[in-house]
């Protein structure tokens, strides 16, 4: 495996001078697409492993916690979203990773034990379009020092506090302007339909995509994947806008205290990196096919954000035919001077903001696509998880994970198929059937980078604090990483 050092100065030109970290690629683990987790079951709709929708790292137990999304089938299968605990070996000198070990699986559930479901709300028993019920599309995760989780849901969008066992504890209050509503009298809430019917709030399948906590756990920050339906000009319903929102929550009350603007990279700049013009992103792709996948606090008022397009290795793209990738990037942002836009509709321009509004500042931290191209690696579609790992001898580890969509696609009749690729053209087989010879399911990919250099100082020392042994031992036991669960762990070596 090739390892090399990337200066963020040389990654690509950002809107402003990029950050000055020294970033070294540490390698990749491909977790097989047919791997299973530790939940009961015997088919892909029950326990196929997928953990790359977001992840967080616990320094005390050296454990990563990654979450699934709503499951295979895109909201048409009763899959129980969950959190997966796993460990990897990380070389203290290079940051190279190896030996993926799944140690526990916890399904998100109500206090009575009823699991949350990836089904659209109106597909739940007795469900309607107007209430979420037990519907959950988990896309972001943060973790408190006591082992509890904050989960960002895309359906609402919602933020839920879960116990370390995955039990629902309480919901935060979603700002009213983010809730999807119809334009009819009364502005009925509608969590299911698209922009043909819903005219304000989050776009369909574009709710909260990431969540993070500040250093003392008093504030949470949830980020939208794309602009709101009303945040833009004309009839495109946000799809031509670059302006999406970050919401600051007070953890104690669960109330939103601020909304800030994050500006996506303009598609013109992205198109300039794509050969020719045949594969350029059109106007309606700006705020729909280009978006944000993750947010991670790194210290003070600074965060890392993954921004990406919808191209690259993934089940649907493999079947349709891969197109040139334009954007897989990590930006360092600072919210210190960002204006509160809680009461502001951003409908005067798709790009420019009113003079009274200052967005979060933004510097390029890492061009993921360029780094992987230099390393001779494939570029997956969905980079959705970022975690600050352990300290190394010189710097620290940063890990990324991809969402492989369970290696599943579906047709217009909502019939699911496994996508197999490898030798020859990609093929589809019945869900759960073996792949043809020479082909495999799309894996979840886990990447490591070593971060060092002057700007590593932007990362708070609290990110690397290790609790007293007695404290974290209790948390590990509470999550089920000892005893029977440890004896059942799965080891995947790459």
Could you say what each language-model-derived stretch is?
Residues 489-494:
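Short, charged juxtamembrane terminal tails flanking transmembrane helices
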